């Protein structure tokens, strides 16, 4: 069961002396048919596990993961489960997979943040809607500098943790198709407008064709090294 799996992770956290256990609801596929029922199920699992988690002296950090929840939905989950033992692993890249401005995500979830995943994103308009692509740190147009400044101010003492994923082809969001909105029926217009503002600032930034002479491992290493270098240089200026 989900409770048994979480219990095993809590035991593992105690062994390695981790103060948190990261967990996820699912992915964007779980929005089909309504994300609400999955949120309710996760709240039930967390409530059933409350004593186990609190007795261990750890907290559960729920990630906004792979297009599953928008910020207001994850905030509601944390509040319903109990913020005394449930918080957030905030990912700066995943909001764009839910047509959400990452800065709005941070503003909404900052009080609950336990740790982070950070990577940059490029967003731009297309005839059908919008395109998004994850990039090396500093190479996107989402405003990573301001994001980190806000994170440090609103989440003092929390880790700046890089999760470097550089996309190949962009992910397309054809929001001009009425059927698209079946997945986002509860999204307020003002929230979506903030996402569009980021798209308006962008321009198409397709990924460079992979060099067949470079292995995927070497390419990933180069992405990580470039992202770490940029982040260290930026943090040194603060």
Model feature map: region roles:
Residues 62-63, 90-91, 119, 162:
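Active-site flanking residues adjacent to catalytic metal/cofactor-binding acidic residues
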Residues 22, 52, 94, 117-120:
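Positively charged, amphipathic and often flexible ligand-engagement surfaces
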Residues 25-29, 66-68, 92-94, 122, ...:
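Active-site-proximal loop/turn and secondary-structure-junction residues that shape catalytic pockets
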Residues 71-85, 96-238:
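Histidine-acidic metal/acid-base catalytic patches
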Residues 33-35, 59, 91, 132-133, ...:
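A short, structure-level motif marking secondary-structure boundaries and short turns
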């Amino acid at each position: 069961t989900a409770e048994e799996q979480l219990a095993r992770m809590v035991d593992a956290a105690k062994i390695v002396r981790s103060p948190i256990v990261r967990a996820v609801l699912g992915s964007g596929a779980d929005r089909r048919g309504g994300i609400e029922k999955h949120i309710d199920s996760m709240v039930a699992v967390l409530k059933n596990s409350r004593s186990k988690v609190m007795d261990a002296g750890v907290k559960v950090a729920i990630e906004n993961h792979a297009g599953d929840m928008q910020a207001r939905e994850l905030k509601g989950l944390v509040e319903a489960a109990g913020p005394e033992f449930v918080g957030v692993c905030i990912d700066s890249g995943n909001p764009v997979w839910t047509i959400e401005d990452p800065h709005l995500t941070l503003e909404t979830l900052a009080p609950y943040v336990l740790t982070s995943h950070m990577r940059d994103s490029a967003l731009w308009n297309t005839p059908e809607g919008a395109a998004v692509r994850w990039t090396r740190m500093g190479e996107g147009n989402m405003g990573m500098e301001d994001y980190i400044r806000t994170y440090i101010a609103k989440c003092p003492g929390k880790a700046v943790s890089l999760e470097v994923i550089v996309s190949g082809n962009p992910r397309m969001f054809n929001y001009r198709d009425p059927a698209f909105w079946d997945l986002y029926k509860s999204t307020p217009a003002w929230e979506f407008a903030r996402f569009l503002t980021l798209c308006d600032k962008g321009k198409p930034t397709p990924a460079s064709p992979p060099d067949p002479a470079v292995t995927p491992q070497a390419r990933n290493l180069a992405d990580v090294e470039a992202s770490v270098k940029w982040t260290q240089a930026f943090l040194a200026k603060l």
